[in-house]
Design a protein with these regions (language model features):
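Bacterial N-terminal signal peptides that target proteins for export
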Residues: 1-8
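Bacterial N-terminal signal peptides
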Residues: 8-17
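Amphipathic alpha-helical scaffolding segments comprising HEAT/armadillo-like alpha-solenoid repeats
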Residues: 23-32, 52-65, 85-98, 118-130, ...
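HEAT-repeat alpha-solenoid elements in large eukaryotic scaffold proteins
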Residues: 31-40
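Residue-level detector of extended alpha-helical repeat arrays and alpha-solenoid scaffolds
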Residues: 40-44, 70-73, 106, 137, ...
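Conserved hydrophobic register position within alpha-solenoid helical repeats
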Residues: 44-47, 76, 109, 140, ...
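Short inter-helical turns and helix N-cap capping residues of alpha-solenoid HEAT/ARM repeat scaffolds
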Residues: 67-69, 100-102, 132-133, 164-165
Length: 187
């Protein structure tokens, strides 16, 4: 057999069979992860953390799967942020900015930015305050507001540029009230 057909077979195996370094997730673990993703109740952070490290691979697979239910993808992304934040970080960035992704999935990505990206969350969240989707603007404003005084200032600055009925403006009003409560009066 010549080198060309062998190379073609190797490429096909890699494309169809996935990465050579990624071990398949055991069926029992995959079933456990899918059970949590499909639960009718809220799954606690402790339950996600109790999963073995291999669960991150299954969660990432679901979060990336465009054929999976958007709610499952959103839950998988949120859980991945708990189980392995380093694996969730690129997905959070990508999905938060993807205007073609379902709103529930974008919202989950935005909700996870602060916990997954830390200080780098601001560079993702601030531009989203101008997103065409109101739910994404609201979630971005809430995430920034919850991140501290600097985030509140970002929300307040953006709110000054839009209508008072915008979700960013409503969040900014609460933010500014909180800032006034925490800043001691000047004497």
């Amino acid at each position: 057999m010549s080198a060309r057909p062998i190379a073609t077979c190797v490429v096909l195996l890699l494309v169809l069979g996935g990465s050579a370094r990624a071990e398949p997730v055991p069926a029992e673990l995959r079933a456990r992860v899918e059970g949590l993703l499909g639960a009718y109740r809220a799954v606690t952070v402790a339950e996600w953390r109790a999963l073995p490290p291999d669960a991150a691979q299954a969660l990432e697979s679901v979060a990336r799967d465009r054929t999976a239910l958007p709610t499952w993808r959103a839950r998988a992304l949120a859980a991945l942020g708990v189980v392995r934040p380093s694996a969730a970080a690129p997905l959070v960035r990508q999905l938060a900015m993807d205007t073609t992704a379902p709103v529930v999935l974008r919202s989950a990505a935005v909700d996870g930015t602060v916990s997954v990206l830390g200080a780098a969350a601001r560079e993702v969240l601030v531009p989203l305050l101008r997103d065409p989707t109101p739910a994404v603007r609201l979630r971005s404003a809430q995430a920034l507001a919850g991140s501290g005084p600097a985030g509140c200032q970002d929300v307040a600055a953006e709110a000054r540029t839009g209508p008072a009925s915008d979700p960013v403006a409503r969040t900014a009003a609460r933010c500014e009230a909180r800032l006034r409560e925490t800043v001691p009066p000047v004497r």
